[in-house]
Amino acid sequence: MKPLNVIFAGTPDFAARHLQALIESQHKVIAVYTQPDRPAGRGKKLQSSPVKALALENDIPVLQPKSLRDETAQQELTALNADIMVVVAYGLILPKVVLDTPRLGCINVHGSILPRWRGAAPIQRALWAGDAETGVTIMQMDIGLDTGDMLLKTQLKIEDTDTSATLYEKLADQGPSALVEALAGIAADTLPAEKQDESLANYAEKLSKEEAQIDWSKSAEALWREIRAFNPWPVSHYQHAGNTIKVWQSHVSEKTSTAAAGTVISADKNGIDVATGNGVLTITSMQLPGKKPLSVADILNSRADWFTAGTQLNNAMGDQG
C-alpha cells in the first residue's frame, strides 16, 4: 500500500484524537486546516484549537482561513497537491470546488450509523431517542449534509449508564482506528462505497437550552433518556422558587404513584422520587444555583425543605412551588 499525502481539517479535541492517529499511521499529513484562533478565558487571549496545538507540536504546517469560499484559500489548497482530505469536526463549510480538489476527494468521520442522525448532534439525539446502538461512519463527502457514500461503519451498544459525555469518549476512541482502517482501504482501492438509503435518513439538529427544560408530564422513561442526552450540555433543568435546578443523573423507579406530574413523592439519601406523566423518576444527582453537581444525599443536608413529600417541582419562572 502506497502511503497517502493527507490534508487534515478539524478543530476540537475530538478531531485532535483523529489527527494523532494519522500522525502515527504510515500516511503523511502534509497540512492541517483548523478554525482561526478565538479569544478565550477571562483575559480573552487568543487561543489555538487542540488540532492546531497538536499540528505545531509535530511540525505540520497549519492554515486557518476564515472561509474556504475564498479564492486565495482555494488556490493554497490546490497547491498542496494532496491525495485526500480528512475532515473531522472542522466547523467550516466546504464548497464543491474544495471537495473536488484532492485526487481522492474528502472524507468525513461522523458520530452515528448513517443515514440515521445526520447533522450536528448525533450522539445526543441517539441517546434521547432511546436507540440501542450508535457508532461511527466514515463517508465520502458531497455537497449535502452528511449525505455522501459510506465507506466504513462501526457499531457501539448504548448502555443504560451512558450519557452524551461517555458516548462521546467511546466514539472518540472508536473513530481514529476506523479512520486509519478506511484510509488503508482507500489507498489499496479495496473499499466499496455504499449509497445511503434516503428513506432511513433523519436529522440530529443542534441542541438548544430550551429543549433541556424538564416537562414532568413526560414519562419517567423519556425524562431518564433526556437527562442522559443533555449531560454534559445543556443539562436538564427545572425552576423552583425562581431558581434553576439542574438534574445530572436519574433512573426510572419501580415505584408507582397517582400524584400529579412533578410532585415529590419521597426524598432520602438514595434519591428524590418524582411523579411523572407515566411512572416515577428517581433523581440521584443535582446542581443548585452557584454550586457544583452533588449527590442528592449532600443536597438534602442543606436543602431538604425544597424536596419534602408533596412539593410540586414546577417549571415556570417565578413559580414558588
From Swiss-Prot:
UniProt xrefs under InterPro entries: Fmt, Formyl_trans_C, Formyl_trans_C_sf, Formyl_transf_N, Formyl_transf_N_sf, Formyl_transferase-like_C_sf, GART_AS, Met-tRNA-FMT_C
Keywords annotated in UniProt: Protein biosynthesis, Transferase
GO CC terms of this entry: cytosol
Reactions catalysed according to its record: L-methionyl-tRNA(fMet) + (6R)-10-formyltetrahydrofolate = N-formyl-L-methionyl-tRNA(fMet) + (6S)-5,6,7,8-tetrahydrofolate + H(+)
EC number: 2.1.2.9
Transferase listed as a keyword: yes
MF (Gene Ontology): methionyl-tRNA formyltransferase activity
HAMAP family hit by this protein: Formyl_trans
Family from the record: Belongs to the Fmt family.
Cited function: Attaches a formyl group to the free amino group of methionyl-tRNA(fMet). The formyl group appears to play a dual role in the initiator identity of N-formylmethionyl-tRNA by promoting its recognition by IF2 and preventing the misappropriation of this tRNA by the elongation apparatus.
Entry-linked NCBIfam families: fmt (TIGR00460)
Name the record gives this protein: Methionyl-tRNA formyltransferase
Species whose genome carries this gene: Shewanella piezotolerans (strain WP3 / JCM 13877)
Organismal lineage: Bacteria, Pseudomonadati, Pseudomonadota, Gammaproteobacteria, Alteromonadales
